[in-house]
């Protein structure tokens, strides 16, 4: 125990709270570059995982499996497998509502926007769409486990990026956005995973 305690003391000594600046400043140009980088990273990540999605369920992908990245790969997937980017088009739907209706847009406006969109959805997203359009169950009940067998799926986790990108250095704001929108389609672990991702983005600035 003494060794463990001394080890923890050493670790916390090297990474104390004094290492975290009380204030971070950056130019608008740097901020914009970081936000663009976040969107680019999400798009690249969707594409990179495309060839292996659902092929290695329950096991790790072996190091011997090549992950190819030919030229124009993103363009190819966007044109031939657009469903792969549900992470992106769900995010953009929510951002569009913020852009048109403001930061205090009512939660029903987000719910109806994606529920009536023509793009394909799966699992938690699809269950929420069904609840909203066909059962008249609006958020937050649309994502509650009593109404959705997919409430704890990863749908919100893979779509929460926008909440962090819109809240640079403001994890509390990212959590508030997540509380409103995440419960449209998720509950419990399905929601907590999204809040975690949104906060990582917010703190990355």
Where do the model's predicted regions map?
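Structured, active/binding-site neighborhoods that engage oxygen-rich ligands
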Residues: 13-205
């Amino acid at each position: 125990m003494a060794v463990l305690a001394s080890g923890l003391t050493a670790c916390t000594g090297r990474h104390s709270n004094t290492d975290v600046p009380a204030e971070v400043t950056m130019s608008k140009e740097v901020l914009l570059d970081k936000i663009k980088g976040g969107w680019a990273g999400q798009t690249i990540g969707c594409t990179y995982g495309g060839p292996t999605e659902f092929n290695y369920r329950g096991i790790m992908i072996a190091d011997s499996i090549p992950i190819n990245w030919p030229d124009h790969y993103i363009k190819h997937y966007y044109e031939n497998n657009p469903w792969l980017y549900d992470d992106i088009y769900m995010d953009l739907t929510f951002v569009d509502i913020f852009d048109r209706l403001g930061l205090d847009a009512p939660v029903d406006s987000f719910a109806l926007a994606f529920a009536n969109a023509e793009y394909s959805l799966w699992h938690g997203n699809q269950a929420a769409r069904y609840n909203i359009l066909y059962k008249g169950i609006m958020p937050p009940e649309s994502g509650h486990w009593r109404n959705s067998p997919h409430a704890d799926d990863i749908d919100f986790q893979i779509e929460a990026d926008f909440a962090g990108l819109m809240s640079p250095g403001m994890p509390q704001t990212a959590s508030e956005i997540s509380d409103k929108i995440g419960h449209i389609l998720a509950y419990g672990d399905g929601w907590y995973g999204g809040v975690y991702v949104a906060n990582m983005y917010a703190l990355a600035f």
